[in-house]
Amino acid sequence: MTSRRMLRACTHPTIAVMLVLMGLIPTVGSAAAVPPRSPVAGPVPVSYLDLNRYLGTWNQLAAVPQYFNLVCARDTQATYARDPQGNIAVHNSCITWANTVNEIDGTAVVNDRQTGAQLHVSFPSVPTQEGVEGPTNYIVTALGPDYSWAIVTDPTRVTGFVLARAARLDADGWQQVRAEIAAAGQNACLYLTSPTTGGETRILPLCLL
């Protein structure tokens, strides 16, 4: 529900190589080399998400690279608001490498009424993702006690986003975030920092920050 499903994916060869090295794109023969794995339990959501406190604008400070966010050069944001149907209106935006604004609107529906932290996010303009109702693809696995930051992934842990109200986190904040990423069963080295105006300007693995 952040820069997720951003349009016009980047296909630069160096990015493709980076994704191969990070294990996000399988290489020839990799399927035969890796033995089948036992089923792994999905990420655990936070015990309770106060949606009213979660509404508003979030800055993406780091993310696991995906085709839909490679178009973004800096200042990736997600803004959430209640819609007339009682769901959550999603507005994602970023500044592209061409210094233009890339944006998309969608809807989030709460699937887990007990915690409020598992949702289905849809985007009408994206093929196969038009349906407002659907399986969970957005799980809030960690929150700052004051809702100053959040970590989001999906049931397969393929995606990952570090969101914050401010454009930057201090060293203690990043330490907490890395610990929570590990607790969710993910590797902080697969997250790359997302440049923000007034915050981190480099793109580097979160484990090296």
Predicted regions and their residues:
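A beta-rich soluble binding module of mature secreted/lumenal proteins
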Residues: 2-209
